């Protein structure tokens, strides 16, 4: 399991944090019982966040409009529409969904929320980027960078613009109408989100080396509660809805403190130092190559000089050969030969 956690932490903070947060909420709320959980739109790829010896989750069902991924084990996977789920009311102890809501069309966004509420017995957790000036600006900058370096927009970010991000007031109107008790908080402080997502885009487009970015990711994710990640404005908002009010917890019990960012300073120093080291290494390599190139240039000049000398000597030899040929053609040379000239 340690290897699995390490692998998860090497993913981008955007991906890791949202699933880690939901898993922690589930652990805190259901600490004393085993539950069945529905992951709406999870595609089954992040199910390991909800499993393990410390997790209260006993069974996991995934519903997603996409076909199941390869090599998925230990879950029930249903390919279906989350706005028209066939489950009975209150079928699952907990229903969770992260970064799916913004990929639902405006006309069915309300239905998505009401369906999640309908099939949950005790708890609903929905996390997504919601409409705000800061979030839209950050997504635009990230998408522009990706498009500049790949020639096409980022698939998921582009859908946020095409389908529109959800609006908090619409969700809260549904919750108020149903008289649901809920908590709301933000994660992925917007500056940090943009920095980390751009770094991971640089990895995807080979601007930065994969090991360097994964080292950044692992440090960030393993110190999530020390990154100031829960300060506002945040990129992602979470709604934690308690259908079973007896399970209500305070926000301070469910998520790390919003304060403190000491580890972020360490991360920035580590990352910049690593970049400086890499830059120095590249500079040293460049200087070495230039030195080799200069040596090669000098050697080339020497070769050219020798070649020139050889050419001159070849011309001299040709001239001598011509003179010898001329001598041999003269009569007296022939007579001299007949008389036995040169005999010993």
Q: Where is each model-derived feature located?
A:
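A short acidic, often aromatic-flanked loop/helix-cap motif at beta-alpha or helix-coil junctions
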Residues: 13, 18, 68-69, 85, ...
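Secondary-structure boundary/capping motif
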Residues: 18-22, 34-36, 65, 85-88, ...
């Amino acid at each position: 399991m340690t290897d699995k956690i390490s692998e998860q932490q090497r993913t981008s903070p955007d991906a890791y944090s949202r699933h880690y947060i939901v898993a922690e909420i589930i652990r805190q709320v259901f600490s004393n019982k085993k539950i069945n959980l529905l992951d709406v739109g999870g595609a089954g790829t992040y199910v390991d966040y909800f499993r393990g010896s410390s997790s209260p989750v006993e069974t996991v069902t995934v519903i997603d409009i996409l076909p199941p991924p390869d090599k998925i084990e230990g879950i029930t996977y249903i390919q279906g529409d989350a706005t028209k789920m066939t489950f009975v009311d209150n079928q699952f102890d907990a229903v969770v969904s992260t970064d799916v809501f913004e990929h639902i069309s405006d006309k069915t966004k309300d239905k998505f929320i009401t369906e999640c509420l309908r099939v949950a017995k005790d708890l609903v957790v929905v996390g997504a980027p919601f409409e705000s000036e800061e979030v839209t600006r950050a997504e635009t900058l990230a998408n522009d960078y990706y498009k500049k370096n790949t020639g096409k927009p980022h698939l998921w970010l582009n859908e946020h613009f095409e389908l529109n991000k959800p609006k908090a007031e619409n969700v809260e109107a549904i919750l108020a109408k149903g008289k649901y008790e809920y908590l709301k908080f933000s994660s992925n402080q917007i500056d940090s989100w943009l920095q980390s997502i751009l770094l991971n885009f640089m990895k995807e487009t080979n601007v930065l080396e994969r090991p360097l970015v994964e080292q950044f990711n692992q440090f960030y994710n393993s110190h999530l509660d020390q990154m100031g990640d829960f300060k506002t404005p945040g990129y992602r908002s979470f709604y934690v809805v308690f259908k079973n009010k007896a399970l209500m917890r305070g926000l301070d019990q469910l998520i790390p403190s919003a304060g403190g960012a000491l580890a972020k300073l360490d991360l920035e120093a580590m990352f910049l130092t690593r970049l400086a080291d890499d830059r120095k290494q590249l500079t040293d390599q460049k200087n070495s190559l230039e030195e080799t190139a200069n040596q090669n240039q000098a050697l080339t000049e020497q070769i050219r000089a020798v070649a020139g000398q050889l050419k001159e000597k070849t011309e001299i030899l040709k001239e001598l050969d011509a003179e010898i040929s001329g001598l041999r053609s003269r009569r007296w040379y022939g007579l001299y030969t007949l008389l036995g000239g040169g005999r010993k």
